[in-house]
């Protein structure tokens, strides 16, 4: 029995995150992005028009934290939100052309960082690992 057989899942995921997070952060830094900003760009590329509150729920962060991320991306010209909407509606966020290009570049550097971390596994192990993570993380 290996050490992993006896370790709690949260501990193992924390350790994987501790290896992956600095790799991804270093890859995103030259693009002027943080990991939360990349997550926001990725969510908006997959689901345009989400509000700040919806993005916060999907990212499991506070609405205040997501609003900070959105404001920075807006200031960078990557995200656009209307100045106002009809009564009772939240502001939908969308990627600008610059945001779509940035999201595409960010996706590429994040995948390269992923590949460096996953290099310890065979290709079939990588696919299975990602499949299992997707299953555990689905709603």
UniProtKB/Swiss-Prot annotation:
Resulting phenotype, residue 114 to A: Attenuates the ability to bind salicylate
Q: Which GO terms describe its biological process?
A: regulation of DNA-templated transcription; response to stress
Name of protein? HTH-type transcriptional repressor Rv2887
Single annotated GO MF: DNA-binding transcription factor activity
The domain of life is Bacteria
Q: Which organism is it from?
A: Mycobacterium tuberculosis (strain ATCC 25618 / H37Rv)
**Binding residues for salicylate:** 42, 114
* Classification of source organism: Bacteria, Bacillati, Actinomycetota, Actinomycetes, Mycobacteriales
Q: How does it assemble?
A: Homodimer.
